[in-house]
């Protein structure tokens, strides 16, 4: 098994470095394409902190379905501020969660990619729609994004298992169907939860803006 890992290591490191470069490029591009006000930075920081707390709170279990509540601040950030907000909340929140739980490892960048992708994709869609969604549009966007996130998580699990010598197709792919269904269920729940949170934050920000 060690020979197999040594043979695959250059490939794995190439993937990890490529993912890191893509994330850096995405952050730089979105940052330059958006005016980052102090209020926006504070809101993104707050949502990032909420993500870390919810990530440690775990998931809501409904039988064999796991609902990930940590995705809420990422989706809210994307719906409020588009790809910049979504990407930064997902990227920073997932990085802090990984750092506090596992420290920095060879696959840290792979584990933060799914939430960064969720925020970026939902944010791009939000901007495309002028930040106004119907329930149907939001449902399709969140379910589609959930499928991408599940695929990225599965890829991260596989690469992590190979690098750390516990590779098992049963472990990585055995629960794939359950993860897909759980992701879709989480997306549907967020359709009902995220918009009221976004509206509440918008009203709060408008109040602060008026007071100034």
Please identify what each model-predicted range represents.
Residues 1-212:
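Loop-helix junctions at membrane interfaces
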């Amino acid at each position: 098994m060690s020979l197999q890992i040594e043979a695959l290591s250059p490939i794995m490191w190439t993937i990890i470095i490529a993912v890191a470069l893509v994330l850096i490029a995405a952050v730089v591009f979105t940052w330059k394409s958006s005016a980052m006000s102090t209020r926006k930075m504070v809101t993104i920081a707050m949502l990032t902190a909420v993500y870390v707390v919810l990530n440690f709170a775990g998931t809501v279990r409904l039988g064999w379905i796991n609902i990930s509540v940590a995705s809420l601040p990422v989706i809210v950030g994307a719906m409020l501020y588009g790809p910049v907000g979504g990407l930064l909340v997902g990227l920073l929140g997932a990085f802090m969660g990984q750092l506090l739980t596992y420290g920095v490892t060879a696959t840290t960048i792979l584990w933060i990619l799914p939430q960064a992708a969720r925020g970026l994709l939902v944010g791009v869609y939000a901007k495309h729609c002028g930040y106004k969604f119907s329930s149907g549009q939001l449902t399709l966007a969140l379910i589609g994004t959930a499928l991408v996130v599940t695929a990225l998580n599965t890829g991260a699990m596989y690469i992590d298992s190979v690098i750390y010598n516990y590779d098992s197709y049963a472990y990585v792919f055995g629960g794939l169907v359950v993860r897909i269904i759980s992701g879709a269920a989480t997306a549907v729940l967020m359709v009902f939860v995220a918009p009221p949170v976004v509206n509440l934050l918008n009203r709060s920000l408008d109040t602060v803006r008026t007071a100034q």
